[in-house]
Amino acid sequence: MSVSKKPMVLVILDGYGYREEQQDNAILNAKTPVMDALWAKRPHTLIDASGLEVGLPDRQMGNSEVGHVNLGAGRIVYQDLTRLDVEIKERTFFANPVLTNAVDQAKNAGKAVHIMGLLSAGGVHSHEDHIMAMVELAAERGAEKIYLHAFLDGRDTPPRSAEASLKKFEDKFAALGKGRVASIVGRYYAMDRDNRWDRVEKAYDLMTLAQGEFQADTAVAGLQAAYARDENDEFVKATVIRAEGQADAAMEDGDTLIFMNFRADRAREITRAFVNADFDGFARKKVVNLNFVMLTEYAADIKTAVAYPPASLANTFGEWMAKNDKTQLRISETEKYAHVTFFFNGGVEEPFAGEERILINSPKVATYDLQPEMSSAELTEKLVAAIESGKYDTIICNYPNGDMVGHTGVMEAAIKAVEALDNCIEQVTKAVESVGGQLLITADHGNAEQMRDPATGQAHTAHTNLPVPLIYVGEKNVKAVEGGKLSDIAPTMLSLMGMEIPQEMTGKPLFIVE
């Protein structure tokens, strides 16, 4: 008979943040003798679950998807926007080999560097700060002919807000003494995603042929003329920017073209028009042999250089368990099942070898304030049985209540949800201790600890950017480390299990065995 395993259990209390003020705090207003006792008597610490510490922009509230990716990855997983912000701030962007090679190639051949993208501070498809950094990179590396083809936003920004952005770039080029804005066009044309090729063709001709419906001496003048025609930013018609005596910025063979959008869906069509030999969306009047760079991978089947390929997450916690022949269980209700499986595994859908999954159906109610305990009793019953079975080396469980009931904004219901969880934690703790296992209790982000918005007085239904608790229950004598974050959890579990931590995990163990 096989030896019974003593499992390492991770319980994620979704939306269970830490806030010391009792006002509007469902967690502190609930009766939680079990969690209170654990916090008082067991090794514990607070960890960050929002902002830069989980790869989001500074001070942005955490969310369940990002939280579970970080929990399972054992490293901060940056979103593209934040990844680029960090790269630019730390100046690694300016040494990106794909970008520098593309610029150097054009410069050394006396060719132009064309930069295109959505000139916007919206941060959804692109960010103008990234485009500015690209202009600086090209200038610093000695490129003389730098042409910016600006797609105008007005969807993720106010409808008429492009003027300040265009002026900023015209001032920049003036200060550099080289380069210019060569064209402007609304995203309606340049960033279609529904195969409306007649629109894309107008943007393509504007850039390749330097031909448009309109022409202006400066980008700001071109924009003002569009406003006079009653075109908002998004719908600005193809406008060539060229003052008297300026060389035309049509694209030529051997030029470099760098597309600075980081979001793929609206970047694919125009990229295919430039890159695909067998392109048939429209008959191209001019096919240019360009050195084309995508900022991120817009599609796996677009064969051209990528400055920032997708970060594949090697050796996440789940994969590392499988490589070490360990058994693991993932268990949650419907609402958070994807989070303890797909997201915790770094975006991998298929279970790893030795990974089992249990899905408990969430109750069929209109809103969860009507049943704040949700399916926690059944979930706990199955979880306790799994702990006592001796089958699993590790178990990952998510209780959705704090988040799903927190989102309703109903304080009384959120209090009931937290009280139901306390009862569950009591049973789980007893089960873990009875088999000599170890338990970590934490959260992926806050929610239930702030049920009213102090600024508006309205119900607060969103997540928070507050820290979350981390508690250790087990037989080991451990000391807690301060200053942790979600990406420290996987290394913490491995260290408590006495396992090696893979080098890809840059997080640090938060409980040190004394």
Curated annotation (Swiss-Prot):
CDD domains, per the entry: iPGM
An individual GO BP term: glucose catabolic process
Active-site residues, as the UniProt record annotates them: S64 (phosphoserine intermediate)
UniProt xrefs under SUPFAM superfamilies: 2,3-Bisphosphoglycerate-independent phosphoglycerate mutase, substrate-binding domain, Alkaline phosphatase-like
Keyword Isomerase: yes
GO terms assigned for molecular function: manganese ion binding; phosphoglycerate mutase activity
The keyword GTP-binding belongs to this UniProt entry's keyword annotation: no
Binding site for substrate: H125, R155, D156, R187, R193, R263, A264, D265, R266, K336
Superkingdom classification of source: Bacteria
Protein name from the UniProt record: 2,3-bisphosphoglycerate-independent phosphoglycerate mutase
Source organism of the structure: Salmonella typhimurium (strain LT2 / SGSC1412 / ATCC 700720)
